[in-house]
Amino acid sequence: MDQGRQVFSVDLLERYATKNRGMITCMAAGNDVIVLGTSKGWIIRYDFGVGSSNDIDLAVGRTGEQSIHKVFVDPGGSHCIATVTGVGGAETFYTHAKWLKPRVLSRLKGLLVNAVAWNRQQITEVSTKEIILGTQDGQLFEMAVDEKDKREKYIKFLFELEELPEAFKALQMETANISSGMRYYVMAVTPTRLYSFTGIGTLESVFASYKERAVHFMELPGEIPNSELHFFIKQRRAVHFAWLSGTGIYHGGLNFGAQHSYPNGDENFVENKALLDYSKLSDGTEAVKPGSMALSEYHFLLLIGNKVKVVNRISEQIIEELQFDITSDSVSRGIIGLCSDASANVFYAYDQNSIFQVSVIDEGRDMWKVYLDLKVYAAALANCRDPLQRDQVYLVQAESAFTDKEYLRAASFYAKINYVISFEEVTLKFISINEPEALRTFLLHKLDNLSKDDKCQITMISTWATELYLDKINRLLLEDDTAIENRDSEYHSVIQEFRAFMSDCKDELDEATTVKILESYGRVEELVYFANLKEQYEIVVLHYIQQGEAKKALEVLQKSSVSVELQYQFAPELIMLDAYETVESWMANKNLNPRRLITAMMRYSSGPHAKNETHEVIKYLEFCVHRLHNEDPGIHSLLLSLYAKQEDDGALLRFLQCKFGKGRENGPEFFYDPKYALRLCLKERRTRACVHIYSMMSMHEEAVALALQIDPELAMAEADKVEDDEDLRKKLWLMVAKHVVKQEKGAKRENIRKAIAFLKETDGLLKIEDILPFFPDFALIDDFKEAICSSLEDYNKQIEQLKEEMNDATRGADNIRNDISALTQRYAVIDRDEECGVCKRKILMMSGDFRMAQGYSSAGPLAPFYVFPCGHSFHAQCLITHVTSCAHEEQAEHILDLQKQLTLLGSETRRDINGNRSDEPITSTTTADKLRSELDDAIASECPFCGELMINEITLPFIKPEDSQYSTSWDLRSETNLANQRTISLPV
């Protein structure tokens, strides 16, 4: 214990605390509230939280001397119970912090209450909830009081000591909510015994159960009249207890979750029990029993004489002695007792007049040393405040284990030390005694305890540990063959441990250094394992290829973290090692670019293959072309070349006939170079394939010529493919015909019959005269008689058909001429009251009433007009005006220009009529007719109301841009303008 700093200190709180109301007989505290009981029957309440005090006379109305026997205050400082003794017997009172007058608990009259157990978990400011009272007669009662009630709610008898009737001196209670209800834990002490009660339900049912079962108690020899029981409360829960007994201080931990069953069927919640004998406090002299006791987290405060001895609960050593400033009039009795305030974590001592406060200052600061001296290392570590303290605990543990030759255990403790011993000292310790196992253990544990910021140290230690692992593996391999089974087991165990270490430290180990170390020890498998961890897959794959394990290499390459470049890099080796597995791997990976595998595929294809062996490259290329729809010309060309080298040309022809680009707009139908394909097929003598390629390239003459070398039927099919060029098609069929005629070796008449039959296959494209030149000059014409007659008959039919067509054409021309003549005589009948569609005036009006259209001559006295088949009629001038206003600008100008020219020609004619001769009157009239015809076409080709002109007007706006000023004039005026107008009120 640090002697330089006091853990407990004493201060005088109140010198004359009783205010001349007698002498202090008892005291209780809770939540910065102190309640004193005096020898004259007064209770004095000090509330240090608000700085107030008040006193209440409990002896009012009682005769004789009255003294306060005991006072009890709840942990919240609101509720107080006091027992008064005097001539008239004992009486118990209840008072609340807000009250000025006490309330008599009449049902307890005559009972001397020595102890009260508060329900700390349930109590509130306005209600005590259930509490337990212990009496001088050895009885227990349950009671509850509410601040608003005029009397206690109830008082129930719970229990009575029958075997050994003694007074109950102290009580404590704890509760816990569990699934089956409320569990109660009660401890009670008498001068010789400590009783414990527990059960589920209500207090009444719990104590009633002890009629059927034995009460659990602890009895110690000796007797003490002032027996006390204290709980230490931490976070509103009791964690340990202490009983001031006749023999010593019986104490232990409290575990209210424990379910320790005893033979008597009871359950105990006390653990780690111990007894502090009073003889340990006497320094060899006669043991003195304390007059009072208080309990802190780690210490007992024992009142012995006028001193308070502070005893460490763990070490059972006195650490301090507290002195009090006692007045001369208090010497007769000295310090009377101690009490504690669990809520405020302070203690109080009192004599007849004064109150002293005992404060605690960081009482747990040296507890780590106490536990360390007792070798309770876990508790010592739990109480350490800084890394240096923890290091000292670890050092003691390490040195102890090292002394006991438990080197592995010592290594684990040394690894946790950061300050009190250096890394070098520890390693030298293990090296000096030749303990590589312990050294490796130390290094591994040190790695676990280093922070991530110590990168250099972590790398160094990891590398050293790697060498130690490899050294251990080599030593196991070099051991004698004795106990081979055990050696192999240990060897495999170390290998697994080493691999786990590399996996954990892969980011800390320097890659280059570790690889060199593994190579130097010849640990190829571990090197591959480490390379895998570091994602150096090139090393891993190369190792598997060297071992001939293509499948394992492919499994590595298939990992998502492996770069696809390695697939291309090792493709040539892998396909030669295991073509099937390699191709299956390629087909499973959709991200590969087949073009970059061409080198590997060509290497495989260049080698010999069995006749019935599946060509793996062809399989992969077919997968690319048909399943992946690959369009790379290189892939298509390679597949084409492999097909061309096969004995059966069926696959080649099927490939050539496939249109892989069909359906794509503006795209090719195939993706290989047809010229390359042609050269390849010519080289490999794949004639049918060459014919197809020639045809595909529109080289039909070459295709037919080549086809004739192997199969005339194929040549005919090729010739028949040409459909859009009749001359070329005929030329191709002539080539076939010539070949057929020249190649026939039978009798002459038979050859002629076959040639005639061939003509029928051409569907009339070739005539007998087309193939006659192919026959020899000495061929008899009789052999062609039938064919020639048939041909002449066909010509005769064609001539007759042409004559009929000429007659039909003549009749058609006559009909057209008649229709034209009839058009000049066509007329229309109009009503006398018919109106012009534009001006709405009558159509049949005198020319004097209407200005004659320029360029038109009047039809007698009537103005010129137009009548359309639909029934609409228009004056000529109205129609011109309407059409020019609706037509586009260019057409309107053309119409006006024609009208102007007609006007000029009309004026010249009128001058001639007036006496001026015209040299070319006929020419002018002809010109006027042409202009008038053009004008008619421009304005009267269709009705302006029923034709396209009216349809186009749908898209025009109602208000034209030039009429915008009229549009704005129709807008409503603004409110401002309306406000300026004068209004006239109209009578209603």
UniProtKB/Swiss-Prot annotation:
CHCR repeat residue numbers: 589-749
Keyword Iron among record annotations: no
SMART domains reported for this sequence: RING
One record GO biological process: vesicle-mediated transport
GO cellular component, one term: HOPS complex
Pfam family, one: Pep3_Vps18
InterPro entries assigned to the protein according to its UniProt record, in alphabetical order: Clathrin_H-chain/VPS_repeat (IPR000547), Pep3_Vps18 (IPR007810), Znf_RING (IPR001841)
Topological relation to the membrane, as annotated: Peripheral membrane protein
Keyword Signal: no
Subcellular location field: Endosome membrane; Vacuole membrane; Cytoplasm
GO molecular function: zinc ion binding
Sorted UniProt keywords: Coiled coil, Cytoplasm, Endosome, Membrane, Metal-binding, Protein transport, Transport, Vacuole, Zinc, Zinc-finger
Coiled coil: 785-819
Start-end of RING-type zinc fingers: 836-886
Consequence of gene loss (knockout): Embryonic lethality. Heterozygous mutants produce some yellowish seeds with developmentally retarded or abnormally shaped embryos. Conditional dexamethasone (DEX)-inducible mutants exhibit abnormal root morphology.
The protein's role, per its UniProt record: Essential protein required during embryogenesis. Believed to act as a core component of the putative HOPS endosomal tethering complex and of the class C core vacuole/endosome tethering (CORVET) complex. CORVET is required for vacuolar transport of SYP22. HOPS is required for the central vacuole formation. Involved in root development. Plays a role in vesicle-mediated protein trafficking to lysosomal compartments including the endocytic membrane transport pathways.
Subunit composition and interactions: Core component of at least two putative endosomal tethering complexes, the homotypic fusion and vacuole protein sorting (HOPS) complex and the class C core vacuole/endosome tethering (CORVET) complex. Their common core is composed of the class C Vps proteins VPS11, VCL1, VPS18 and VPS33, which in HOPS further associates with VPS39 and VPS41 and in CORVET with VPS3.
Similarity remark: Belongs to the VPS18 family.
Name recorded for this polypeptide: Vacuolar sorting protein 18
Organism: Arabidopsis thaliana
